[in-house]
Curated annotation (Swiss-Prot):
Descriptive protein name: Tyrosine recombinase XerD-like
GO molecular function (one): tyrosine-based site-specific recombinase activity
Residue ranges constituting the Tyr recombinase domain according to the UniProt record: 90-238
Record-linked SUPFAM superfamilies: DNA breaking-rejoining enzymes
Length: 238
């Protein structure tokens, strides 16, 4: 069975940012080129995986993840009559990767009755992975409470982030959020510090850890965070 070229159809069906779309495109073109003169068989998939072994472990995992998602799309849309999946590579642990294992925290104290601006800021960072610069660009109208999503625009790219009910029930009654969003970075820093000893960076990392635990791919997570590259996230996928 030949590998059909449905790359454009696949990318159109996904709500990727321009950068994430570009990453998937090149990964899938690489896959398509390999199978140009080969049939898709389990043996051929093993050969493809072997060819990837010359790349870094992170690049191998990325290309395999892209390929597996593409195979699933083809199978679900009846473009191929058999589902194929490449087994992910197991990255050998190195001293650097072993030394970085941050613990996931739940922060139940963040989800009490809303009592101060710092608590609202902490929730924005933990629920959406926002930094202070992104919070300063928010408008209350960006929150769609009917359909439970937050729209953020950064460098001309829009991100649509889901709003969880546990966040909505605590903050949607706020009347003066735009006043907070208009404050200086120093003001936001001070208010967060009044509420918790955790820094914005530490809280944002917890958002990342929870998304990794939930099964988000490195590309999906980069898209959620509005990142133009995946470099800063690779350590969480080792």
């Amino acid at each position: 069975m030949k590998l059909p070229n449905e790359i454009e159809e696949y990318l159109v069906s996904r709500n990727f940012s321009e950068n994430t779309r570009s990453n998937y495109y090149y990964d899938l073109v690489y896959l398509q080129a390999f199978f140009e003169d080969k049939s898709v068989t389990q043996e051929a998939l093993e050969l493809y995986k072997h060819q990837l072994s010359k790349l870094s472990p992170a690049a191998q995992r990325r290309k395999i993840s892209s390929a597996n998602q593409y195979f699933l799309f083809l199978y679900e849309n009846k473009k191929i009559n058999q589902f194929f999946k490449i087994k992910q590579v197991v990255q050998k642990k190195t001293q650097s990767s072993e030394s970085y294992h941050p613990m996931i925290k739940e922060f139940p104290e963040f989800y009490g009755p809303l009592s101060c601006p710092g608590q609202f800021l902490a929730l924005l960072i933990l629920e959406f992975g926002l930094n202070f610069a992104e919070i300063q660009k928010l408008k209350w109208e960006n929150f769609n409470w009917n359909f439970k999503y937050l729209t953020i625009e950064k460098a001309g790219i829009k991100r649509v982030l889901p709003i969880r009910e546990k966040f909505a029930i605590r903050v949607k009654a706020i009347k003066n959020a735009d006043e907070l969003f208009a404050k200086s970075r120093q003001f936001l820093y001070t208010e967060l510090k009044k509420f918790t000893n955790y820094s914005s960076k530490e809280i944002r990392e917890q958002y990342i850890l929870h998304q990794v635990k939930a099964g988000k791919t490195i590309y999906e997570l980069a898209n959620l965070l509005g990142l133009s590259t995946i470099t800063a996230l690779e350590k969480y996928y080792r």
